[in-house]
């Protein structure tokens, strides 16, 4: 008889312990249900990185003195700095600057040791591309344009195709009443309306 009572007592203890463990597990589950979700719907929601996040490097062309400190402190000698010596000013002039973010380890040494603070880390972390060559950012992709738009070798032929006579780069240099080499869209519409 005592053996049956002992078995019933052990069964009751086991039941109480099982209920306790189930209750602990459910309390953890309900606690997590009340919390804010950890994941975000990425393309539509974006996490805000911390203040000292090391993202894509921003480069300011006008501040760079072509000292190449960034190349010397980089563990993989990554930044490509092309410069030429200006004999009149007796100093280096930067011609081209590029960084390949497919190889960069984002250590931040170049930013830390730059004497003119022309390099800085941004909070941009979306650097995905279909082709690895697209991750090679030149001075235009890293920051703002290196020269005036009127001196850009890509813009010069386009401007000559447009509305100014050949060789004239600024509309302010034209005398009043001079003919343009092309027609503006408004002029084309006016001619079409006049002929119909």
UniProtKB/Swiss-Prot annotation:
Belongs to the complex I 23 kDa subunit family. Binds 2 [4Fe-4S] clusters per subunit. This is NAD(P)H-quinone oxidoreductase subunit I. It comes from Crocosphaera subtropica (strain ATCC 51142 / BH68). The lineage of its organism: Bacteria, Bacillati, Cyanobacteriota, Cyanophyceae, Oscillatoriophycideae. Pfam families: Fer4_7. One of its GO terms (biological process) is photosynthesis, light reaction. SUPFAM superfamilies: 4Fe-4S ferredoxins. [4Fe-4S] cluster 1 binds at residues 64, 67, 70, 114. It is found in: Cellular thylakoid membrane. One of its GO terms (molecular function) is NADH dehydrogenase (ubiquinone) activity. HAMAP family: NDH1_NuoI. Residues 55-84, 95-124 form the 4Fe-4S ferredoxin-type domain. Residues 170-196 are annotated as: Disordered. PROSITE patterns: 4FE4S_FER_1, 4FE4S_FER_2. PANTHER family: NAD(P)H-QUINONE OXIDOREDUCTASE SUBUNIT I, CHLOROPLASTIC. Keywords: 4Fe-4S, Iron, Iron-sulfur, Membrane, Metal-binding, NAD, NADP, Plastoquinone, Quinone, Repeat, Thylakoid, Translocase.
